[in-house]
UniProtKB/Swiss-Prot annotation:
Top-rank EC class of the record's enzyme: isomerase
GO cellular component: cytosol
GO biological process: D-ribose metabolic process; pentose-phosphate shunt, non-oxidative branch
Catalytic activity: aldehydo-D-ribose 5-phosphate = D-ribulose 5-phosphate
HAMAP family (UniProt xref): Rib_5P_isom_A
Protein name: Ribose-5-phosphate isomerase A
Protein's job: Catalyzes the reversible conversion of ribose-5-phosphate to ribulose 5-phosphate.
Organism classification: Bacteria, Pseudomonadati, Pseudomonadota, Gammaproteobacteria, Alteromonadales
Subunit annotation: Homodimer.
Keyword Cell division: no
An example Gene Ontology molecular-function term: ribose-5-phosphate isomerase activity
Amino acid sequence: MTQDEMKKAAGWAALKYVEEGSIVGVGTGSTVNHFIDALATMKDDIEGAVSSSEASTQKMKALGIPVYDLNSVDRLSVYVDGADEINDRMDMIKGGGAALTREKIVAAVAEKFICIVDNTKQVNILGEFPLPVEVIPMARSYVARQLVKLGGDPVYREGVVTDNGNVILDVYNLKILNPKELESQINEIVGVVTNGLFAKRGADVLLVGTPDGVKTFTAK
C-alpha cells in the first residue's frame, strides 16, 4: 500500500464520525483532500462544512458541499484534519500547509477533533518536522531572534503568505519535550499570531492509515 493509499484509507475512515444534518469542520492538506472526496458522497445528508483554508473551500465548493463562515455557526460536532507529526499523547505539529491559524480556530470550536494521518506521521517526540510559526510581517526579525533564544533555528518560508496575509517562520532543531509549555511560550512572543503546536487542543481520535488497514487511537 502506497503512502497516498494509506492517507486515503484514513480519510475515508473519518466519515463514520460525521453526524447527519451537521456542519463539519474540515482541515487542509493531502490527507484531508481524501476526506473531502469521501464527504462529497454524503453531501445531501449534512448541512455543510466550515473550512480552515481557501484551498479546502474551493475543493468542497467544486464538489457541491456548502461552505459556511465560522462566525455564522454555533456548533461543530467534529473537526477532521491531518498532522505533520503526532505523538502518543495526541499532541501535534501542524501547519506545513501554512493554514495553522485557521485550523486552530476551527479546532477550538469543534467538540471532537479527528486526526487523520498515514503511519509516517507518528513519532515519540515532536520536533523533527520544523515547527511553523505564523507571524505579523513587521515582527518577523524580532520573533526570529526570540525563537533562537528558545533553542530553535527559524527559517523564513520564502514566497508564502498565509490566508490571513502573514508570513511563516519554520523552526528547526527543537526537541519538544513539553509541547503545551512551548506552545504557550511561543504564543506569548509579541508579533506571533499562533504556532503549529496543537497540544492544548490535541486530537480526540487518531485514525492512522497503515499497510494493514486503519488503526484507531483514542485520547486517554
